[in-house]
Structure formats: C-alpha cells, structure tokens
Amino acid sequence: MEMIGAWMTIKRGQDWGLPAEAGGADQFAANDMELRAIVEANCSDQTPIPVVGLTGGDLWRALGAPAGGRRRLQSKEAREVSIDVIDVCLGDQNYIAVAHIFFLTSWWRGPVTAVMNSEWRGRWRVAPRAHPNDGWLDVLAGDLPIRQRFLLRERLVTGDHLPNSAIRSGRIKEFSQEFSRPTRAILDGVDEGRHDSVSLKIRPDALTVIY
C-alpha cells in the first residue's frame, strides 16, 4: 500500500457542501448499488455524471443518514456535496465503486482487505476516519483466527476494533496487488467474482450528490 500525494478535497473541521436547490437532482439512487450503476453507465458512455439524489446506502449513512427520503430532497434541509469515487481494474475489466470494496476468499478464513470510501458497511463502522470527499481511501487488512473474527464482528458495530495489532490500516490514493490465489472482489455489496489482481485509485470530486 502506497500513499501518493498530499492534497485533500475537504479538510477536517471545514464546512462541507452547500444548500441544495429544490429539484436539483437529475436521477435518484436508494442505495450504493444504484448510485454505482449511474456512475458506471455515464463513465462507459463518456457522458457527464448527473447530479444524484441519494436516499439510502452506506454512503448515505456516512452523510448522516438523514430521514425523509425524496421529500427531504425537495426541502430546505437538502444539502449538495461533492463525492469521490474509486476507479477499479480487476484483471482486464474496469469498474467503479462508491462506498467500499472487500477482497477475500472467505469471511471466516484467509486474508481480508477492506478499501473504504465510506466509514460504514451495513451495521459495521469499518473505517471511523473515512470521509467520502477527503481525497483518500482507508484500507484495513488482516488474517485473524476464527475466535478473533467473532470478537471483531461485535466491535465493528461501534468502531472499537481499532487499533488492533492484527489489523494493518492506512490511508492511500492508489493500490495494486497480485493475489496468491483467485480472490473475491465485492464492490458496494456486489460480488464481482474471483480475480488474480487488482489496481485501483481515488477519483476526487467525481460526482455531486444531494441528500
């Protein structure tokens, strides 16, 4: 894992985003998979990524999980923010991820690597320091015994699993790895099959989200 560069899109303690205009969303996504599909479709067509109204998912939870659904997006409480995404190459196939990526052979044995743009994966607060617009990805990797994995699952709910001497963690902008055996790649909750290698990098300020 290598850190590259030193800039940040948003600085800690700095106000993030702006009040959103009513009707400002071009498309809507209720979860990370739907948001990812919108981004991938426009990247594939080489067309501008539309402004997306987001009402659910792990990225939405990192934004504070505001209630109200689409009704909120039309209200004075709606906010507009820039979001980073992850460009991913698995073998010779290109993908986008918006919230997180997991590399593993099994949840219960073998190494697991998490690449996080959002701090959340479901109920798990995997990367408490992660921010979806700071220009960095948070990476955690480990190969824990089964007993420690059970304990870790409990601590992931509150984010108290770090620091842990059995888990390597860091912040990166780019990442590449050759796997010793074909390894599952799970992008935003979607299993994209087993692959021998991966390369990825952060794409800062890739899209605008209203929430």
Predicted regions, residues:
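Short, well-ordered strand-loop elements centered on a beta-strand within folded domains, enriched
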Residues: 92-100, 111, 138, 148-152, ...
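Catalytic core of DAGKc-family lipid kinases
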Residues: 1-120, 126, 171
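ATP/nucleoside-binding phosphotransfer catalytic cores, i.e., glycine-rich phosphate-binding loops
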Residues: 141-211
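Short edge beta-strand segments in beta-sheet-rich domains
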Residues: 47-49, 134, 195, 204
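A generic structural signal for short beta-strands and their flanking turns/coil linkers
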Residues: 82-84, 133-137, 173
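Short low-complexity stretches enriched in small and charged residues
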Residues: 91-100, 129-134, 158-168
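Internal helical hairpin/lid segments
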Residues: 107-152, 157
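A generic structural micro-feature
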Residues: 77-80, 129-131, 167-169, 192
